[in-house]
Amino acid sequence: MRAVTWALDLLFPPRCPACDRRTERVALCADCTSAITPARSPLCPVCGESFPGGGPDHRCTRCLIRPPHFARARACALYRSDHPSPLVEALHRFKYGRDVTLAPLLSAYLDEHCPLSIDHDLLIPVPLDLARLRWRGFNQAAMLARFVAVRRGRRFDAMLLQRRRATPPQVGLGESERRRNVARAFAVRDRSAVRNRTILLVDDVMTTGATVEECARTLHSAGARRVDVLVLARAADA
């Protein structure tokens, strides 16, 4: 088996999924790892929006005007649309390049840099519609959530929250358009499995939060006691 591994490494040497530099294993290289911007205080204690400069955590204007249905949303890292993070570059290869070999790397990063205490009754991924699921072949959020659930010894259900209809991609839409786009797009398959439970909703990225907010609203309508949100990366300029 070691000979096979050695031969594969010789023919297909491991490379950093962000910059394509050769590495000892499938992992972000040291330069790309150091270029990731962690999501740190000061931030909104509700949605996790990051604020520039110093000062204490405080609620953002968005959460003051329209309190979300989730209790907390947190990201492991931040990125800007004009300066993509190496973590997002790797995520795009996983998600759009359908490179499932990156699932363990990204899932481990999510678990190891998780800013939340994971004591929830249930971990649920943001679901894909059937057309996207068939095209991609997997739900990236489900792969991330399952890895964290197994590692933390928590229950995981990829089928409990479902999309009732296909929605156009959120990319390029404004905040109000994003909310309308996903309005009533989700449903809970078994309300008894959600009732009075604490739920951690997992996704890959968060921009304005419209999708996770609609998911949280749907879960609360089904009787969930509390919904938190965990994502790999969050847009710092949404």
Language model segments and positions:
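Glycine-rich phosphate/pyrophosphate-handling loop used in enzymes and phosphotransfer proteins
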Residues: 1-238
